[in-house]
Amino acid sequence: MIRLRVKEVAKEKGFSQGRLSRVANIDENTLKRIYRDPFAIITTETLDKLARALGVPSSELIEDVPDK
């Protein structure tokens, strides 16, 4: 199972949710959903936009967690 680490990385980089939404040019509601649900399904395009905005490789925004 893949877990998104967007919220954690954004916090480490000093990004508020609103600022990240603007810089990444993604809908604020999409980002809210990602923040609420780290297992949300997103497009690779959205993942790439978030990674570029945060200045990290996209691989840093995902984590493989074992199924329970």
Which residues does each PLM region occupy?
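The alpha-helix within a helix-turn-helix
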Residues: 10, 21, 51
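A short, Lys/Arg-rich alpha-helix, primarily the initiator
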Residues: 1-14, 18
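Short alpha-helical DNA-recognition segment
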Residues: 15-33
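Short, charged recognition helix plus adjacent turn
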Residues: 8, 62-68
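Residue-level detection of the helix-turn-helix DNA-binding "recognition helix"
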Residues: 11, 25, 36-39, 66
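Helix-turn-helix/winged-helix DNA-binding modules
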Residues: 1, 12, 39-42, 53
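DNA major-groove recognition helix of helix-turn-helix/homeodomain DNA-binding modules
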Residues: 45-60
